[in-house]
A protein has these predicted regions:
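Short beta-strand to alpha-helix junction loop
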Residues: 56-62, 85-110, 238-249
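FAD-binding beta-loop-beta segment adjacent to the flavin cofactor pocket
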Residues: 41-43, 213-219, 267-292
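Flavin-binding catalytic cores
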Residues: 190, 213, 217-222, 227-274
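N-terminal FAD cofactor-binding segment of flavoenzymes
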Residues: 19, 40-83
Length: 292
């Protein structure tokens, strides 16, 4: 029986797994096709890809800054420079933006490269049996661990492990904000020296020019377009039913804002993140080795 079951291979799960693996046996389970969680990377063709979730990391605390700088020394991350335009003209301190060397999911890949990870493995039930956990997977298999660490979004964590959580944890009510993202490939468009644009708009909040991350060279322009909180909240539960409709709305709005013509799009894909991030800081109280 292994010591730790980690649910989720995002940055949080990967960091925890790497640290625990120094002195314990660890195994990771993730419902996705690959590592990364919110820092996932979507491949288009060959080495052309989109960071369609987390766009970059900008450390605020000294401890996290040192952690990221160490990853930079190991060539797991690099700096995303050039021009980042803010059309909202908000006053914010200039900060260094770090990205994964081969996609933002490369951060997780690097951290868990020596740890057994199971993808397409959804944890459907957890049960504590005296001194170990029984984990049921989507294929009905059961696996057994001494300790359990859940790094999934809080609403999912709460649903999965409710009866084992303390009242203090159950009463935590983080405001999870959704995000709707469109990935688009443009042909015959100028390669602008702009890395990202923050818009003052009701539909589109932000867009990243993937070419400027210098992971590939292409005549095609790849843009990741992320919508506003208001637009995302309104439409997150209906985009699956009519993806083409919402892709068109967002791409036409992007055309109006930038001049990039929707008719020049040769690939487009929409993705909805139901639990993209927390709106406000929430005091977290939990034991990262056991839930009881």
């Amino acid at each position: 029986m292994k010591d730790f079951c980690i649910v989720g291979s995002g940055i949080a799960g990967s960091v925890i797994a790497k640290e625990l693996a120094k002195e314990n046996s660890v195994e990771i389970f993730d419902k996705a096709k690959g590592p990364g969680g919110r820092s996932s990377n979507r491949r288009y063709k060959d080495n052309l890809s989109f960071d369609h979730g987390l766009q970059y990391i900008s450390p605020k605390s000294n401890k996290f800054r040192k952690f990221i700088q160490n990853l930079e020394k190991k060539k797991a991350v690099t700096r995303w420079e050039n021009n980042h335009l803010d059309l909202t003209f908000e006053k914010k301190e200039t900060s260094i933006k770090y990205i994964g060397n081969r996609g933002n999911n490369y951060i997780s890949k690097y951290l868990i490269k020596n740890i057994k990870t199971n993808y397409k493995s959804t944890v459907t039930n957890v049960k504590f049996n005296s001194n170990y956990w029984v984990i049921t997977l989507n294929n009905k298999d059961k696996v057994f661990f001494r300790n359990l660490v859940l790094t999934c979004p809080f609403p999912q964590l709460k649903k999965l492990s409710y009866k084992y959580l303390t009242k203090e944890i159950v009463n935590i009510n983080p405001q999870m904000v959704p995000n709707i993202t469109v990935m688009a490939v443009y042909k015959d468009c100028a390669q602008l020296p702009i890395s990202s644009i923050k818009f003052d708009d009701s539909v589109i909040a932000w867009a990243a020019h993937e070419n400027t991350k210098k992971r590939f060279i292409s005549r095609k322009s790849l843009w990741t377009i992320q919508c506003t909180e208001k637009f995302s909240k309104k439409n997150i539960n209906v985009i699956r039913k009519n993806k083409k409709k919402y892709e068109k709305i967002i791409l036409k709005k992007f055309e109006a804002l930038t001049g990039f013509q929707a008719k020049k799009v040769i690939f487009q894909n929409i993705h909805g993140w139901k639990y993209a991030y927390k709106k406000k800081k929430t005091r977290a109280i939990y034991n990262c080795t056991k839930l009881i």
